[in-house]
Amino acid sequence: MASEARESPANNPGLSTNRDEATKGYIMQQTMFRIKDPKASLDFYSRVLGMSLLKRLDFSEMKFSLYFLGYEDTTTAPTDPTERTVWTFGQPATIELTHNWGTESDPEFKGYHNGNSEPRGFGHIGVTVDDVHKACERFEELGVEFAKKPNDGKMKNIAFIKDPDGYWIEIFDLKTIGTTTVNAA
């Protein structure tokens, strides 16, 4: 298969084929976004994207809060604060929203850089949905801002929406992502 050749070590200098046994059990656990207003961000990630709040940590001395969100079922999560923290940090693919207190009401605060304008850096996170077109119809009804709709551009059947701080979220489904990427490559 042609796709196997692209992933082979010969075509990817620097790729190690010997996974160190010490890394067994590692997971991609979180990515962090700095946010201006937790009320707006929590509404977006819970109501629009359907995530649950897994854990909130407040650091009074340093004047910031952390909100961990994901798609895990919280009904079986531990209620003990320490156990809940350990449980949260064991979940794969969570989002950590970091709020520095006061930014939500500071007229001088201009927001954070999302990485998609110069100087480019971090690009986006991705969320798999059942049907990208139906999901995007719902997002439009909810007034979500789009960076790209599913029928725009050369890569069809993927979309990019923006959260309240302007971070991009790629939206795709498993029914179309394979052909979408193969046709664009």
From Swiss-Prot:
Per the UniProt entry, the Enzyme Commission number(s) are 4.4.1.5
Amino-acid positions noted as binding Zn(2+) in the UniProt annotation, renumbered to this chain: 30, 96, 124, 170
In terms of InterPro entries, this protein maps to: Glyas_Bleomycin-R_OHBP_Dase, Glyas_Fos-R_dOase_dom, Glyoxalase_1, Glyoxalase_1_CS, VOC
Q: Which cysteines are joined by disulfide bonds?
A: none
Q: How many and how are cofactors bound here?
A: Binds 1 zinc ion per subunit.
* Pfam families (alphabetical): Glyoxalase
Q: Where is this region: Disordered?
A: 1-22
Q: Which residues form the active site?
A: 170 (proton donor/acceptor)
Which GO molecular function terms does the record list?
lactoylglutathione lyase activity; metal ion binding; protein domain specific binding
VOC domain segment(s): 27-174
The UniProt keyword set, sorted, is: Lyase, Metal-binding, Zinc
- Pathway where it operates: Secondary metabolite metabolism; methylglyoxal degradation; (R)-lactate from methylglyoxal: step 1/2
Enumerate the cofactors the protein uses: Zn(2+)
The record lists substrate as bound by 30, 34, 100, 120, 124, 154-155
Q: What class of enzyme is it?
A: lyase
Catalysed reactions, as listed in the record: (R)-S-lactoylglutathione = methylglyoxal + glutathione
Function statement:
Catalyzes the conversion of hemimercaptal, formed from methylglyoxal and glutathione, to S-lactoylglutathione.
Q: Indicate the family of this protein.
A: Belongs to the glyoxalase I family.
Q: What is this protein called?
A: Lactoylglutathione lyase
